[in-house]
Amino acid sequence: RVDNGEFITLHGPSGCGKSTILRMIGGLEDITSGKIYLSDELLNDILPRDRRLAMAFQNYTLYKHFNAYDNMALGLRLRDFPRNIIDSRVNDAAKLLGISGVLGQKIKALSERDKQKVALGRAIVCQPKVLLVDEDFARQDPERRKEMLCDILEINEELKITVLYVTNDPLEARTLGKKIVFMKDGKITDIG
């Protein structure tokens, strides 16, 4: 059971199924057995776009000819949100992530750090119940990794968004997670 606003780490050796479970929750892979619930909703029967989830994976796609603002606003525009709500959410997310100054710049002109923050901002402007983060999203040099993990913790604490974070680093799992789900060979072996 995952409570609203929790920060959960999925921990285990490489290849044990952590990322696969994340992808199943996000609807990127079929749920092969069992049932996955979000609150009281059975996700197995809900289309991925209707799950109120956001994902932060290494292979995020940004539209390089759009500016940062338009990339972050895209999901809201596709859902026909009013302009004032789009403005408010994009600006709030940019402020939280420290990228307000780059909103008008084209993606192709941004640093990798800022591109990653735009991708994270795009994930949170839709106000998901849960943010799914694969460890590859934060994989980079130690200083950038620390900054990205701080951003994810701040999203969890400030916005009260539940975070499911995959890692095979035991220290990171203990440091970040309020609850740790241990996995081995595709199965949950312990929850602590």
Which residue stretches match the model-derived regions?
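Conserved ABC ATPase signature
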Residues: 106-110, 114
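Conserved ABC ATPase "signature" region
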Residues: 42, 77, 84-102, 153-154
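Short coil-to-helix segment of the ABC ATPase nucleotide-binding domain corresponding to the Q-loop/switch region
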Residues: 66-75
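Helix-to-loop junction immediately C-terminal to a conserved catalytic motif
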Residues: 26
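Conserved catalytic motifs of ABC-family nucleotide-binding domains
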Residues: 127
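The feature captures the beta-strand-to-loop junction immediately N-terminal to the Walker
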Residues: 11-13
